[in-house]
UniProtKB/Swiss-Prot annotation:
PANTHER family: GANGLIOSIDE INDUCED DIFFERENTIATION ASSOCIATED PROTEIN 2-RELATED, MACRO DOMAIN-CONTAINING PROTEIN
The protein's name in its UniProt record: O-acetyl-ADP-ribose deacetylase
HAMAP family attached to this UniProt entry: YmdB
Residues annotated to bind substrate: 11-12, 25, 33-35, 122-126
NCBIfam families with a match to the protein in the record: PRK00431.1-1 (NF001660), PRK00431.1-6 (NF001664)
Gene (UniProt): ymdB
GO molecular-function terms, A-Z: O-acetyl-ADP-ribose deacetylase activity; purine nucleoside binding; ribonuclease inhibitor activity
UniProt cross-references to InterPro entries, sorted A to Z: Macro_dom, Macro_dom-like, O-Ac-ADP-ribose_deAcase
Taxonomic classification: Bacteria, Pseudomonadati, Pseudomonadota, Gammaproteobacteria, Enterobacterales
Native source organism of the sequence: Cronobacter sakazakii (strain ATCC BAA-894)
Length: 180
């Protein structure tokens, strides 16, 4: 698994990958934070694609994911996943967050893409504690990659320094594990 997981700091809309994961809200219609940034960078085609998905499937529930075209982004597709709102950890939040990562990876693999970039899902307005969210992200992604050949590369793209340092530390721990 070493070499398949990467941690970078920056703007997820500028990362050179096949698929960008959007930490979406259930409506899929854009919002604040990374969701708004992705929608602004992708232009009206992304909103139209999300509107079509919503008309066909309704809102996207926490832990679920859908895939659309990428609009004006350099990526080939966008996976929209809804993470849980943090309510103290007693409302199935850890499982829902893991599901958001796992279901996103399954969509990337099922569509034959080789690389994907994830933001720190649920750690903005949804209030998930950053360290706990990073641990779940790493555990879920690394477990998935040990069982599946696709995607070949996963990037955790951290907008802020706090998340970047958390993810860098976890990457170091995972790289040190036997068999990693």
């Amino acid at each position: 698994m070493s070499g398949r997981i990467n941690v970078v700091q920056g703007d997820i809309t500028l990362i050179d990958v096949d698929v960008i994961v959007n930490a979406a809200n259930p409506s899929l219609m854009g919002g604040g934070g990374v969701d708004g940034a992705i929608h602004r960078a992708a232009g009206p085609a992304l909103l139209a694609a999300c509107r079509q998905v919503r008309q066909q499937q309704g809102e996207c529930q926490p832990g679920h994911a859908v895939i659309t075209e990428a609009g004006d982004l350099a990526a080939k597709a966008v996976v929209h996943t809804v993470g849980p709102v943090w309510r103290g950890g007693q409302d199935n939040e850890p499982q829902l967050l893991a599901d958001a990562y796992r279901n996103s990876l399954q969509l990337v693999a099922a569509n034959g893409y080789n690389s994907v970039a994830f933001p720190a899902i649920s750690t903005g307005i949804y209030g998930y504690p950053k360290a706990a969210a990073a641990q779940i992200a790493f555990e879920t992604v690394s477990d998935y990659l040990t069982r599946h050949p696709q995607p070949k590369q996963v990037y955790f793209v951290c907008y802020d320094e706090e998340n970047f340092l958390l993810y860098q530390r976890l990457l170091g721990q995972y790289d040190e594990q036997p068999g990693a």
